[in-house]
């Protein structure tokens, strides 16, 4: 429940964060397909004997090389099988949180028997599309997700249509929080962060708790490329400084290591991505600890980073050729700059420098190597903050960076939304040729 005295715009900010910052177990593209399969299985009469699935090229790209939690296996087929046999249809992005050892074994057996197929949907005009059809004899159920990782638009069985999402907005219905956010500015977001009641945003502290637990798992286990653990060892060997900069990179990349390596711990996601949530959150948590920030100060920094990351990513396609760890790290830069300095000018300079630094990084699918990009983005964010604290930043005379941070963001997002579409097609073509 909201305080009725709360600024209506601020209420929409909070709703936007609650919609876009959610726990997610496993990489969200395979999880989206697992959710479709799980919901379909819940509609099916009898046990699942066969699974057929179709996904958009972008979802295929992000599902080819990532480990599905608890299975030790990579790819969309195991995600679809486990979703159908062991998923919790009501758990959203945590659909696999209750999967048992028996369900995992059954899913692997279904896969080994050749009863699971995942193909690219053709034609497909959607960036994010997943459809799962499960069978029991001649009986079947089919679920389609479009536009968002949990946005179910159609459910159908052999008996007929069960559910279809209405395309139109009902008369009098409130505008979505993301639509409101798209018309705001970073300055307005900062005003909200500085002035909102702590009680209204205390919930965001959970994002620090979840991602810190994932980071600790990444440092204690042998997950993915174990970048965080490796860099921590280099600190002990004297090859890397034991300082704040190293700690930011180590703890952030460790969380991504665990997530991409298949750890059965949820990440607090941002904009439908666990890695984006990790990249935005962990650098700020480390800096907050360094300065001894209390819960209220940390919560305000977390709201700033999450809203900034959502605000930027909302101007992009849900999935694209641009590595979104870079835009999430712009949120981290905002949060860290606020903790150290608090000035709008410092925050905007840090984001501008980020755009001038890592904006060309491509997304070549979800995999263990995502942790490399997460670590690079986190490092770049702290570098940009340090520059801004010295009143230095990439200026509007250089590259795609403009004199105004809002225009710089728009320039970056235009690049990803339009010019990089051909890049995305080339990446998908290369990855598809490897999978043949």
Swiss-Prot record:
Membrane spanning stretches: none
GO terms classed as biological process: L-cysteine catabolic process to pyruvate
A molecular function (GO) term: L-cysteine desulfhydrase activity
InterPro entries linked to this entry: Ser_deHydtase-like_asu (IPR005130), UPF0597 (IPR021144)
UniProt xrefs under Pfam families: SDH_alpha
Family: Belongs to the UPF0597 family.
Name this polypeptide is given: UPF0597 protein YhaM
Gene coding for it: yhaM
